[in-house]
Amino acid sequence: MSINKILSSTYKITQRSNNNNILFNGLKINSFSLCNTKTNLFTNKTNINLYNNYSKSSKSGKKSKKDEDDEDGEIETSKTSKKSASSSSMENVLKELEKSFGKGTLMKLGSQFSTQKVEVIPSGSMGLDIALGVGGLPKGRVTEIFGPESSGKTTLALHVIAQAQKAGGNCTFIDAEHALNPQWAARLGVNLDELFVSQPDNGEQALEIVDSLLRSKTMSVIVVDSVAALVPRVEIEGEMGDSHLGVQARLMSQALRKLSPTLKDSNCVLIFINQIRMKIGVMFGNPEVTSGGNALKFFSSIRIDIRKVGTVKKGDDIIASQVKAKVVKNKLAPPFKEAIFDIDFQSGINKTGEIIDLAVAEGIIDKMGSWYSYNDIKLDQGREKTKYLLEKTQPNLLVEIENKLRDKLIKSKPLINQQQEEEGNDQTSDEFDIENDDEIIEEDIDDETIKK
C-alpha cells in the first residue's frame, strides 16, 4: 500500500494558508504532519516486525518446551528401563547367592527384621527388666554380667535360669569355677533335676561344650561362670610362674567369633559371668578392667555392672544385701539405666517387694497409711504382710499386677505370661466362634421358616 492511499484514507487533509503546507499529489499537506506520519509508519512497521519476531520466538519456545517434555519423558523411560534391568540383575544375583550359600543369604532389612519382636527371658528382677528396656535378657545375644566378689552375679544368672525353666526351656550351667551351690540354686527356684551342669577341665573344653550346645538348638539359657576361670590348656600344662601373655584373650576372641553365628540361630541366651581386675599404675580414670580381653565387650549386646551398695537389717541381723545393677551397654534400648533391688539371704532377689514398690509409685496399688489395696480389694497392712499375701495366697493377683507394670513401663511381658495369655486367647476365641456359629444357625432356621 502506498503512502498516498494511506494518507487519503486515514487523515482528512485541510488546506491552510500558512507556509507549512506543501503540495503532495495535488493535495496540500502539512510538512510536520507528514514527518510524523512517516515516523508513525516506520514505528508501526517496526512494531509489526517485532511482533512477528516475538510470535515466531514464542512458537519456537513452545516447540522447545515440548521438546524438553519429550526429553524428560525419554529420560524417565530410560531410568525406568535401567531400574527394571537392575532389579532383574539383582534377582539373578539373589538366585545365585541362594543357590551357592542357601536361602536367606541376602535379605531386605525391612521385610525380615523390622516386624520381629525381641524374645526375652525375665531376669528375676522387675526393676532390672525395666532398666533393660525390653523386659529381660534377649535371646540369640551375648550378655555379660560383671562386678566385684559377692555382688550377686551368679545369683542373678540362676534367677534367669529359674525363669527359663518355668517357661519349659532347657538350661546349662558351665561351672568353670567349680563353686556352684545346689542348695542355694534350689532356694532361688531352680529345678535341679532339669538343670544341666558341666565342670570342664580347661577353657577350650568349656567353649567347645558351649559351641556343641548352641549347634544342637535345644538350650534356652547357657551360663558360663566365669570367664576368669576359663584357663587355657597351655597354661594348665605349663609350670607355675610361666608367662602366658594374651593367651586367654586370644582364646575368648576366637571362641566368640565362632559362637556368634550359631548363637543367633539357636535362639539362646548366652550369659558370661566375669570378674574385675585392677590396672597397675593408672593415675586417672577407672582402674578396673574385666578379664578375658576386649572381645567379650564388643560381642556382648548387654553388659550389666552389678555391685553391692548396702545391707538390709532386721534388728541387729543382716538379712539381705542391697545391690545396684547398671546397664553399661545395651544394643536394644537406651543404656546406662540403673536398678536397685534386695537379694535376700533366704530366697534371693526380692521380686515381689519390687513389684509392690513400683506398683505404688505408678498408682496401680493404693497405699493409705500402712494399708495396701488393689482395685478396691484390701490386701494387708505393712509391706511384708502384703508381700506374703501376694506370694502365698494370691499369686494370680501378683501376676496381674506385674503385667500391668510391664504394659505401662516396658511394653513387654515375660515369655511365661505371653504363652499363658496366648493359650487363654485361643480358648476364648474358640468359644466366641462357637457362639457365632449358633447365631448363624438360628438365623438360617428363621429364614427357612419365613420361606415356608
Swiss-Prot record:
UniProt main location, coarse: mitochondrion
DNA damage as UniProt keyword: yes
GO molecular function term, any single one: single-stranded DNA binding
CDD domains, sorted: RecA
Signal peptide: none
SUPFAM superfamilies assigned: P-loop containing nucleoside triphosphate hydrolases (SSF52540), RecA protein, C-terminal domain (SSF54752)
Keywords on record: ATP-binding, DNA damage, DNA recombination, DNA-binding, Mitochondrion, Nucleotide-binding
Domain of life: Eukaryota
Binding site for ATP: 147-154
Chain intervals with Acidic residues compositional bias: 420-452
Subcellular location: Mitochondrion
Region listing for Disordered, in residue ranges: 53-90, 412-452
PROSITE patterns hit by this protein: RECA_1 (PS00321), RECA_2 (PS50162), RECA_3 (PS50163)
A biological process term (GO) from this entry: DNA recombination
A Gene Ontology term for the protein's cellular component: mitochondrion
NCBIfam families, per the entry: tigrfam_recA
HAMAP family: RecA (MF_00268)
Function of the protein: Involved in DNA recombination ability. Important for survival following exposure to DNA damaging agents.
Family note: Belongs to the RecA family.
Protein name: Mitochondrial DNA repair protein recA homolog
Organism listed in the record: Dictyostelium discoideum (Social amoeba)
